From Swiss-Prot:
Family listed: Belongs to the fem-1 family.
Job of this protein: Substrate-recognition component of a Cul2-RING (CRL2) E3 ubiquitin-protein ligase complex of the DesCEND (destruction via C-end degrons) pathway, which recognizes a C-degron located at the extreme C terminus of target proteins, leading to their ubiquitination and degradation. The C-degron recognized by the DesCEND pathway is usually a motif of less than ten residues and can be present in full-length proteins, truncated proteins or proteolytically cleaved forms.
Naturally occurring in which organism (per UniProt): Xenopus laevis
Protein name: Protein fem-1 homolog B
Pfam family, one: Ank
Subunit structure: Component of a CRL2 E3 ubiquitin-protein ligase complex, also named ECS (Elongin BC-CUL2/5-SOCS-box protein) complex.
SUPFAM superfamilies: Ankyrin repeat
Subcellular location: Cytoplasm; Nucleus
ANK repeat placement: 47-77, 89-118, 122-151, 155-184, 188-217, 220-250, 485-529, 533-570
Amino acid sequence: MALDGLAGYVYKAAAEGRVLTLAALLLHRTEPEIRTLLSTVTQHGGQRSTPLIIAARNGHSKVVRLLLEHYKVDVQQTGTVRFDGYIIDGATALWCAAGAGHYEVVKLLVSHEANVNHTTVTNSTPLRAACFDGRLDIVRFLVENNANISIANKYDNTCLMIAAYKGHSDVVHYLLRQHADPNARAHCGATALHFAAEAGHLDIVRELVKWKAAMVVNGHGMTPLKVAAESCKADVVELLLAHSDCDAKSRIEALELLGASFANDRENYNITKTYQYLYLAMLERFRDPSNILHKEVLPPIEAYGMRTECRNPQELGAILHNTDDLHLEGLIVRERILGSDNIDVSHPIIYRGAVYADNMQFEQCIKLWLHALQLRQKGNRNTHKDLLRFAQVFSQMIHLNEPVKSRDVERVLECSVLEIERGIARIQNPQEPDAHSTLENHECNLYTFLYLVCISTKTCCSEEEQPCINKQIYRLVHLDPRTREGGSLLHLAVDSGTPVDDFHTNDVCSFPSAPVAKLLIDCGANVNAVDQMGNSPLHVIVQYNRPISDFLTLHAIIISLVEAGAHTDMTNKEKKTPLDRSTTGVSEILLKTQMKLSLKCLAARAVRLHNIKYQNQIPRTLEEFVEFH
């Protein structure tokens, strides 16, 4: 059997822990062959690993012992493995065994001089893997064998931080006794106390406080107290308020933020606790009549119904039994305390909007979502999901015969243009490892823009409103964004392969779309734009495979393209004209009835057909014209 084929069997035996089968497969093989077989990297299930790595990953100590003691396999081999949905590049057998909780394999590897401080591509150590998994026995063994507890990963996230976040109190206690720094800061500015507070691990918060963990702000201006309040971790908030030496303002804002967060949190919704904590905070503000701590309230915001936040116990008492007012009060309080640029402000706004949409209260939903969208764009956050959410709710409204305001569509189109503009800039300056997702998001935004254009064609617009919508379409058309295949907006509008989101959107939008194509053309879309294969929109539409049942769409698009100056004799990179690319007799007939070849087109085709030299003989604009033919 060839070595390539045999390597697969060797890997399978190691992965399944079949030590006798593995030994039999390697019997009578030469040393170079054995070295090759045991160092071959096999790709399987998204992993790239050697027999040693997969055996360690799966906890097969007998296989690991055989490979190390009999075949002297390099204990420092690295591969790519999957753990809890994460892909780990550069992992050793020791990292895998530690992360998977295989204590005997860990001991075996360390006894064969595996490097306990070897780091993966993201600077993760075997000790960090064990802390993630919460295996105190492995953590203790590694530390006793010189594992460095201070090595942080590439985000400066320490072993103590991951153990605190995952809730492994015994590991946290052990690391602190081994002098792990409770005040080390991650790249985002957070400490172990931030992570424990966010996750609501009360015992760990108590332990960290005992070890003098400081109440510092992270990169978003959040203390562990604020993080706990924002995450609805009431017991942690109360513990920190009892132990930390915070001023009156911090104490009051923690109670207000906790109450406000209970009002609009999908997982922790509790309107009773909302009022309870807001009322406690209000009492704190009015505790000393000679020194009332007044709120610095936000100016009224349209999304919140132009409400002003309650400023005294009487105003708060007046909304006790009005849950809708309490929901909005919660959103206003959160935005005041966290600041409009905080990354967490928008999520509850979106949630509350979704609840309104579920209850058919679309106007309130759209106001809230527009506010959240503007906050996220102001903070330069990625908004492709927010934009799609609007296409979905507008489609739902149209499907239910609910009126959609053209002004709302225009505002979302405007935000969509901005997001696509930013997306183009991100693509031109890619930041690894986000390059692929940046391109994915960019294409999603192009599709969403087309959904919004399609929705605009089904929305009642006044004579004053239509030009406002057209202005946003014009802006994007002249940016000329492209897909990875080089398709323009017009290509997508006439392509039956353009994907349509299936949550409400496909009830209203479909492609090819004659109204969308016409509107794009009216706003200046180039009817002779070509993709990477040299195909024009006309090349695309003539391949539509529903020419009978959707004849009107096919006919209208071909007419619109030709009347706007689409060249019916234009060739793609395979030298095929739209007529050559037609896949049905109907599209052929429609094309032939529209073909009005100019003398200029005939001359260009003759030049190309007879290979007459024309480069540098005619004006550059004419050269491009000839090349199209």
